């Protein structure tokens, strides 16, 4: 990643990239949806693949000269299928939101009912939020967590499904720290004749390595991002454990008559030309590299350490008097309720930023504050683990966070943040992010 040419060609963009490199190198990244890709992934994403238009799919492109981008996409698809032990993979979605849109558009018509996890309880915008297409085009209903436990009660999910009779049920979240009961969700979906979709954008790496429940045998369709715990480039993907005939009865003409189209055909057509045109072949090349990395034994060791680090952080937070929604974590993240600390998520995010620690403010279940203020914040262990930090460092980081929050009302808070920032920087120096380029 040598930027000498860029430095001379466009000093302003170069300066922004260099400053971002320094930020990532010298601060602690705890945003649960962020991670650090390898140099190999970045080289693939910065390659000549960016020059090629390739509308369509390998072997069936609308442009010529696609024989080598076909190789990259086939590698990405084959590796994804091997990684998740599934029969179908579409690696073209530009994002997790695009993947979700393609699935919802495939199975639902405008006005159909969908049932998803409440955004304010830890869900995602694309699961029915009224500010998103999923809540504007569809009749969206929600299930959430129980106030007493912070966990999803499957009996309540079943009651809601029977009440609203959705066409599609979505399981998955952006801020839920527990594993998902996919088999039970499937039983409920079958009872109301609904399609079941799992959005595993956050725990995908833990699922791929067998550390969390596998949605593939139970969910009709699975979507994910390719960054976060998968540690690849920013993008999306659609998977199916097993292809099947579409339940809407959409047919294709054959030489001898008609046949029911497979769901894979509908999904492929919805991704392109339905919602996208040309795929980002440089990103797909990066996805192929990342999936190859995830198939190595070292990746499972990494994911095991992510889980250990998250558990250590949760334990330390609890020992210091913090409330974690659901009382702990099964995956890489946790959601901290700050209402007993008399500080907002917004203020916490800002103060920690001053201290060299990046988190995001986050609504907690039954929050009485706006999404721009919030009563909580979210923490994830994936990025710090990529730096090879372990449980001891995880607990130290929580102590840094507590030092800032506990002194938030102090007249000396700026000086305290600076002290913590120096400690953070010293810790980061012990665990360098990249060894192929200096940080300044």
From Swiss-Prot:
Reactions this protein catalyses: (6R)-5,10-methylene-5,6,7,8-tetrahydrofolate + glycine + H2O = (6S)-5,6,7,8-tetrahydrofolate + L-serine
SUPFAM superfamilies: PLP-dependent transferases (SSF53383)
Cofactor(s) this protein cannot do without: pyridoxal 5'-phosphate
Record-linked HAMAP family: SHMT
Residues modified to N6-(pyridoxal phosphate)lysine: 228
Function as written in the Swiss-Prot or TrEMBL entry: Catalyzes the reversible interconversion of serine and glycine with tetrahydrofolate (THF) serving as the one-carbon carrier. This reaction serves as the major source of one-carbon groups required for the biosynthesis of purines, thymidylate, methionine, and other important biomolecules. Also exhibits THF-independent aldolase activity toward beta-hydroxyamino acids, producing glycine and aldehydes, via a retro-aldol mechanism.
Record carries keyword Transferase: yes
GO biological process: glycine biosynthetic process from serine; tetrahydrofolate interconversion
Protein name as it appears in the record: Serine hydroxymethyltransferase
Keyword rRNA-binding listed: no
Pfam families, per the entry: SHMT
InterPro entries, per the entry: PyrdxlP-dep_Trfase, PyrdxlP-dep_Trfase_major, PyrdxlP-dep_Trfase_small, Ser_HO-MeTrfase, Ser_HO-MeTrfase-like, Ser_HO-MeTrfase_PLP_BS, SHMT-like_dom
Residues reported to bind (6S)-5,6,7,8-tetrahydrofolate: 119, 123-125, 370-372
Site, Plays an important role in substrate specificity: residue positions: 227
Entry's localization field: Cytoplasm
Transmembrane region(s): none
Entries under CDD domains matching the protein: SHMT
